[in-house]
Amino acid sequence: MNFKKRAFLFGSLSGIFWGLDYTLAGQVHTLLTMTFLVSMWLTSIHDLGVAATVSVVSKSSVKKVKDLKLWQIISICCIPLLGGLAMTMYMLSTRDISTGTAIIISSCYPAVGMIGARIFLKESLTPLKILGFIIVLIGITLTAYSELFDQANSIIGLSFAILAAIFWGLEGVIYKMVLNADVSANTLLFLRKISTIIIFLPFTWIIIDTVSIYVLLLIAAIGVIGYIADLAYMQAFKYSNVTLAMSLNITYIIWGPLFAFMLFDQSISILLLIACAILIFIGNYLIFKSKSVY
């Protein structure tokens, strides 16, 4: 299997398993009174489950952490800050703008990744790649269209959503930079998740008594699915450029509602979901056929 086919396979798998991971984690969230600190706490426990899975399936990758260069360690430790800030900006944006608007704007992170990859990694920007992403964005817009006008949009809310897209886009560029330096996906994942725990847990320890141990064990178990999703995402970056990896990963927007329908009987518009899926697939196929994907 050549690099482009591997990239498409792993990118697609990352979207599928992210959709499943987010759906299951979302159901756990409904068991709690959600606050920012509780959300950070659950993220830490989820990432603990991912790190534990890495340590079980690839002990050698954990040992390789000590062989990383200083710039690699610093870069990886910045990822949870960017990811955490992005999620914070997204959550704050939904207070002041409609959920649909927040989803659409924050889902532009592949565009930020595409520009960041051009600046920092010298990846080329081809007309086919740009056209493909625009079609993907149209598909994403349709998935959230019904929620676009739930409430009035404010400048502050729009700014938060834009910042979320920027932080998520830069996160992907760092992933690619580190993987280009021959750091294994499992080593990167382990240090990235441990960094999240170290950074987030001290701030959330005060609410430990408010979360049931059974909920914590459940979210940690879901971390196994998160591991598969994140590993596939890393492999997509390894075998392709930033734009394709991110645009395939963003298909979780389709898979999430589908899993929610199959597992929890949540209502969805099947025809709308199919139309969105077709558009997102066409857009990703154009990016896949771009000569700049390797």
Give residue ranges: language-model regions:
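Glycine-/small-residue-enriched transmembrane alpha-helix faces in small-molecule transporters
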Residues: 1-42, 81, 89, 150-177, ...
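Juxtamembrane helix-loop boundary signature in multi-pass membrane transporters
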Residues: 1-12, 108-166, 274-294
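Loop-to-transmembrane-helix transition segments
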Residues: 6-15, 63-89, 156-164, 210-232
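Helix-helix packing/entry segments at the starts of transmembrane helices
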Residues: 9, 13-15, 42-45, 100-108, ...
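Juxtamembrane C-cap of transmembrane helices in multi-pass membrane transport proteins
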Residues: 17-34, 49, 88-97, 105, ...
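Hydrophobic/small/kink-forming positions within alpha-helical transmembrane segments
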Residues: 19, 23, 80-88, 110-115, ...
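Transmembrane alpha-helices of multi-pass small-molecule transport proteins
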Residues: 32-85, 167-171, 189-207, 221-224, ...
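Alpha-helical transmembrane segments of compact multi-pass small-molecule transporters, enriched
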Residues: 49, 53, 105-119, 134-135, ...
